[in-house]
Amino acid sequence: MERFALLIGLKGCIMASPRKNTSRAQRTAPDPALKNAPPALPAPPTTDERGTAFVKGTPLGWTPGVAFRDGKTTIGGSPWTITTLPRRVRPFAQKLFEAGRAGLTPATKTEVAAAIFLLDLGLADPLPIARGPVDDVDVVVPVYKHAASLERCLASLAAEGLPVIVVDDASPAADAARIAKAAAAHGARLIVRPKNGGPGEARTDGFNASTAPFVAFVDADIVASADWVSRLRPLLDDPLVAAVAPRVVADVQGTSSIELYEETRSELDMGAVPSRVVYGVPVGWLPTASVIMRRAATSDPPFEPGLRVGEDVDLVWRMDEAGWTVRYAPDVINHHEVRTSLRDFVARRVMYGGSAAELERRHPRRLIPARPSLLGIGVLGSLAFGQPLIAGAIAGYAFARTRRLLGPD
């Protein structure tokens, strides 16, 4: 049996995307046709194992962009759906909608159940508020060359006093000496790889050397907020959450074309709207430039050795496909260094693009540049065949239908 998730298509048109309701066992098993397929992820907790304790005392916010109509219908979420809320959920949903981003903490058993319902549809999200010092997170920083960036990164991480593991991915001798000096100066443990294997293998080495139940991965060109782990760690109190990431924005210092581009189109910046990271939404993947992961939700090794680029996307997609929840919390912001060299800019994008074919092979139909709706295709087709009046009529119908769904505001 198939269920359909309504997705926003081209120019605000709406299309239906079928999703098979597969069992958890089917979702967690790797594709046997894949050569060197990664090991299956551990199964996520059952409803009983998950429980409800994680919601108690947790302030929630209404997710921006989600419409709430007639006291019972929501439009939006992740994945994007039109939902008629159960009667038991509506009173708390109304209160939370009115509170907005100011937040509201569920107080009764009924409100706790309603909160979980809203969280699981991406209609609400937990607000990232620190609850005190964190003692169950290790930080892993992979680095290759770029010792100066690492020094800034380690200085920013010092504020929370967490254990830090630096993994030098076989940097040249001069860089390696400076990396070792920086690690020692900040009290970080240093692992030196004998051979360069790429960021995924470096992260895996750091992950294996850590012992904490949660591991924060931070790229060496990141300048972290002073309390980013303390604020994001409570979101992992939900046993179903495998990973959570902050927003990563470009640290723009100048006005060059590359810097201005990075400020508005950085591949690491997933936007300002919180989201569950699932197929078919704007935040459909997360980079590991800054992310906290649950050890119990990862495979061994966590990052696929066969992927030198895109291994972070692969892991997040495998988590989603296995039934885990991955959250994006942009209220917390880290900054990444902008490299202004045109050569570096082009090389990085060529590198990212190089992972597309392998990711598509491992996750068929997830890596699609555009998902136009039938109405959108109708508009483009009419224009292509010289029928602007028909194109205008289709576009007008789509616009009117969307306005009816979303309401006047």
Sequence positions of predicted segments:
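Short aromatic/hydrophobic "clamp" motif used to bind/position activated sugar donors
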Residues: 215
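Acidic donor-binding segment of Leloir-type glycosyltransferases
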Residues: 155-192
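Short, flexible, basic/aromatic active-site loop/helix in glycosyltransferases
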Residues: 246, 262-283
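Glycine-rich, basic loop-to-helix element that forms the pyrophosphate-binding segment
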Residues: 193-210, 274-281, 318
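Conserved donor NDP-sugar-binding/catalytic core segment of glycosyltransferases
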Residues: 227-259, 337
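Acidic, low-complexity/disordered tracts enriched in E/D and polar residues
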Residues: 16-98, 120
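N-proximal low-complexity "stem/linker" segments adjacent to membrane-targeting elements
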Residues: 24, 35, 47, 88-91, ...
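Catalytic donor/gating beta->alpha subdomain of glycosyltransferases that bind UDP-sugars
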Residues: 313-365, 396-409
